[in-house]
């Protein structure tokens, strides 16, 4: 029997890792699962978070699996199957991956007998949909166009008329999309799987990819990353002040995503997440050293690093 291959896509900070954690800890508990993580950069923060669930995690950090590292992606899938013999592989691409490019890579004839593409999921951040679309519409529309299921995340407190507008936007691009408008934190893993797998309408991947112009997925912004490890103790209050400084785009560039695992001055570890002027923290297990990853475009890395000194 072929290994099931699920792909969980979504822009930076949309909630991909949160969704995968829900699936592996609550939904697919009876299956042998391996997660293939394609981090944007070489500091695997999301990889460490997923490993903390007890699931096997492999990672690709050399590039994006939709383009420059597509060969590494397929080789990694083959290696995972040979090494772990899993029931299911869940792939989390980078937040700036073109989902259509990943699906095209999966159609490589040499690997057809190894796996079967099962769930193709994109996570959309409802609260920041307009913000993200303003500079990454090509990525967002590409993910919508080729997904089987769209999960609307971070939807608590959002006006129903706005969500209805998102439904219309999605259906205008992908009429057959299965849309899930549930709070990921409140829905059970089993109910989530049922909503994902039992409501898929007709899906012809080759036909969809043929209709999608490859040039349409080019993005005018060139995202870059600044990442580093540190043994310095940094309080969360200091992190909030640093990220407040990033509102000065002339000095630091446009910061669209930040995440890290750090130790505070009381020797307690915590994880922080930053997306569009909103930052939050949660406690974390002990690490050997802290790590920070900042993603954006036109980054002034020297000025950013000065804030952490």
Annotate each language-model stretch with its function.
Residues 34-36, 259-262, 294:
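Short, hydrophobic beta-strand segments that form beta-sheet elements in well-ordered domains
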Residues 90, 151, 225-227, 293:
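Short aromatic/hydrophobic contact patches that present stacked aromatics
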Residues 101-102, 135-136, 162-166:
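Residues at alpha-helix caps and immediate loop-helix transition turns in enzyme cores, especially N-
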Residues 290-296:
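Short, well-ordered beta-strand elements
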């Amino acid at each position: 029997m072929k290994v099931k291959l699920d792909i969980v896509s979504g822009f930076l900070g949309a909630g991909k890792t949160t969704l995968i954690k829900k699936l592996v800890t609550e939904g697919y508990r009876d299956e042998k699962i391996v997660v293939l993580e394609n981090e944007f950069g070489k500091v695997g923060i999301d990889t460490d978070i997923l490993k903390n669930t007890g699931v096997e995690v492999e990672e690709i950090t050399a590039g994006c699996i939709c383009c420059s590292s597509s060969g590494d992606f397929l080789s990694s899938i083959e290696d995972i199957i040979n090494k772990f013999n899993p029931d299911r592989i869940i792939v989390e691409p980078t937040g700036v991956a073109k989902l259509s490019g990943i699906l095209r890579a999966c159609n490589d004839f040499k690997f057809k007998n190894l796996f079967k593409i099962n769930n193709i999921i994109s996570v959309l951040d409802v609260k920041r949909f307009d913000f993200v679309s303003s500079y990454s519409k090509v990525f967002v529309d590409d993910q919508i166009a080729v997904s089987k299921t769209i999960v609307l995340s971070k939807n608590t407190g959002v006006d129903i008329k706005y969500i209805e507008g998102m439904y219309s936007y999605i259906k205008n691009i992908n009429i057959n999309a299965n849309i899930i408008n549930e709070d990921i934190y409140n829905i059970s893993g089993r109910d989530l799987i049922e909503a994902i797998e039992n409501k898929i309408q007709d899906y012809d991947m080759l036909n969809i990819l043929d209709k999608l112009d490859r040039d349409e997925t080019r993005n005018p912004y060139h995202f870059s990353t600044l990442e580093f490890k540190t043994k310095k103790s940094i309080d969360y209050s200091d992190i909030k002040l640093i990220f407040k400084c990033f509102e000065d785009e002339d000095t630091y560039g446009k910061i669209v995503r930040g995440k890290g695992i750090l130790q505070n001055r009381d020797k307690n570890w915590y994880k922080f997440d930053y997306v569009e002027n909103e930052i939050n923290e949660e406690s974390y297990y002990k690490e050997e050293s802290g790590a920070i990853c900042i993603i954006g475009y036109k980054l002034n890395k020297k000025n950013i690093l000065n804030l952490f000194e």
